[in-house]
Amino acid sequence: HVGFINVDGEKMSKSLGNFFTIRDVMEKFHPEVIRYFIVSSHYRSPVNFSDFALKEAKTALSRFYHSFKAYQQMYGQKIVETLEQGFVERFNAAMRDDFNTAETMAVLFELNKELNRAVKEETAEQATVLYSTLRYLTNILGLVQHDVDEFFFFFFFHEALYLSDKEIDNFIQQRFDAKRAN
């Protein structure tokens, strides 16, 4: 990525005190979420970095993992060499269009939606082709590289480490209120 990095709408700089390293960010966010965040914007456009934006990236990336989990629960890890060419062609066209990753993401989310529909309707052959296609295309961008359960396990425990004092106090109060209600 070669665009400027903005932090909450301001250009990142040491003099403004809004400077951080990638290591700092990786202490709070899964590396694949950071990758998704960067890949989802055009490589020459400025990136507006914020915790909120990274949380949105986590939510978006999680949609792929949820779909993969739903497929795997129905059909296991089965993949086929046959790919849904319409999606592959649209993805490739977006990549040839000055690495238009915003458009590639639109293609991936449309494909993800079709995969979810096929899994829900239990059309095994179609679901397998769509799953195989989505795996292939996300792989090109280096996304959805982890075991589904490991990915979600990371968030369950990692995010608990970064609860604010206020969030911890809220959980304590909720527990206290629940005990008192019983």
Model-found features: residue ranges?
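Helix-loop elements that line ligand-binding/catalytic pockets
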Residues: 47, 53-125
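Short helix-capping and inter-helix turn/linker motifs at the boundaries of alpha-helical repeat units
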Residues: 12-13, 81-82, 86, 162-167
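Short coil/turn segments at secondary-structure boundaries
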Residues: 2, 37-38, 75-80, 104-107, ...
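Alpha-helical recognition segments enriched in aromatics with Gly/Pro capping
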Residues: 1-72
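Basic, alpha-helical terminal appendages of large translation-related enzymes
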Residues: 106-182
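Short acidic (Asp/Glu) and glycine-rich catalytic loops that position anionic groups and cofactors
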Residues: 5-6, 15-16, 36-45, 85-89, ...
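Non-catalytic interaction-recognition regions
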Residues: 31-33, 38-39, 96, 100, ...
